[in-house]
UniProtKB/Swiss-Prot annotation:
Pfam families, per the entry: TsaD
Organism whose genome encodes this protein: Saccharolobus islandicus (strain Y.N.15.51 / Yellowstone #2)
One GO cellular component term noted in the UniProt record for this chain: cytoplasm
Enzyme class: transferase
Reactions catalysed, as given in the entry: L-threonylcarbamoyladenylate + adenosine(37) in tRNA = N(6)-L-threonylcarbamoyladenosine(37) in tRNA + AMP + H(+)
Protein name, UniProt field: tRNA N6-adenosine threonylcarbamoyltransferase
The keyword Acyltransferase is assigned to this record: yes
Molecular-function GO term, any one: iron ion binding
Cofactor notes: Binds 1 Fe(2+) ion per subunit.
Length: 331
């Protein structure tokens, strides 16, 4: 079985191709939209994805050394994500499905991140940290679905860091030589400033932390503010994670999503793993950010259990939660 996967939920337009036997991933091509200034405007995202889609599709097929006729199914991320961006991927997937008579496989973007984590880390029964620009979720698989033990109550951890560095003119670009701008800034800081620390049960709140940090700009060294906001945010995440580990007694902790690439977070998680005697399994950088390979791979798993959707019912779902998705391939 060969599945072509399309990812377009946010800043990245990606196309991946997955096979139902090793090495599983045959292609993983993408292009990310980076605004010249400010945040991402939905209209700019749509324009970028529409212009990049043809080139990325062709590159993926060339990388896998196959033609579109060799593909069995078309998988597409229908949510969660930004509406105009989602529509580009959905429109391309529907067009390919109709023109080449291929069944369409609906994929939840979050499930894509989680399943590529299972594949690349070889985790068996982990507690999962899903950390990206739009999501901060602590979850694990139980009775047919991924159940949420904790999540952000407002903005996501990755989004909080992006907004801070943008507001203090450290970004865009947000990632420089593999490092987030807040990590680069934090390396020159050492003073831990007093900022809000909000953990409620296993849920976290980052909006007050962001506001308080921005109010310190001009009053404290920017490097110390960067250091403080990052350290406090990561400590909040670790406290919530420790509570979930205590509740679930899991012996593996799998980290997926773009924030998983943070070197400083990795060090904290490794220390947590030693303290709790838990194996830390972090998705490789190539598959940490948004990518088409994870959609193709999750689509392949879904297709193996007959999960398809009619083209005329393939609506985008910008607020599609991970705990709303049935996972028949793990039962």
């Amino acid at each position: 079985m060969l599945v072509l996967g399309i990812e377009s939920t946010a800043h990245t337009f990606g196309v991946g191709i997955a096979k139902d036997q090793p090495p599983y991933i045959l292609a993983n091509e993408r292009d990310a939209f980076v605004p010249k200034e400010g945040g991402m405007k939905p209209g700019d995202l749509l324009k970028h994805h529409a212009e990049a889609s043809g080139t990325i599709l062709r590159r993926a097929l060339e990388k896998a050394n196959i033609s579109i006729n060799d593909i069995n199914y078309i998988a597409v991320a229908l949510g969660p994500g930004i509406g105009p961006a989602l529509r580009v991927g959905a429109t391309l997937a529907r067009a390919l499905s109709l023109k080449y008579n291929k069944k369409l496989v609906p994929v939840n973007h979050s499930i894509g991140h989680i399943e590529i984590g299972y594949l690349t880390t070889e985790a068996k029964d982990p507690l999962i940290l899903y950390l990206s620009g739009g999501n901060t979720i602590i979850t694990t698989f139980y009775k047919g679905r991924f159940r949420i033990f904790g999540e952000t109550l407002d903005i996501a951890l990755g989004n909080m860091m992006d907004v801070f560095v943008r507001e203090v003119n450290l970004a865009p670009p947000y990632i420089i030589n593999g490092k987030h701008a807040i990590d680069i800034c934090s390396e020159k800081g050492s003073k831990l400033l007093k900022l809000p620390y909000v953990v409620k049960g296993q849920d976290m709140s980052f909006s007050g932390l962001l506001t308080a940090a921005l109010r310190l700009v001009g009053k404290e060294k920017l490097e110390d503010i960067c250091y403080s906001i990052r350290e406090i945010a990561f400590d909040m995440l670790l406290e919530a994670t420790e509570r979930a580990l205590a509740l679930t007694s899991k012996k593996e902790l799998m980290i997926v999503g773009g924030v998983a690439a943070s070197v400083s977070l990795r060090k904290k998680l490794e220390e947590l793993g030693k303290e709790w005697d838990v194996q830390i399994k972090i998705v490789p950088p190539e598959f940490a950010g948004d990518n088409g390979a994870m959609i193709a791979y999750a689509g392949m798993l879904a297709a193996s259990k007959g999960v398809f959707i009619d083209v005329d019912k393939s609506y985008i779902r910008p607020r599609w939660r991970v705990d709303e998705v049935d996972i028949p391939w793990r039962n």
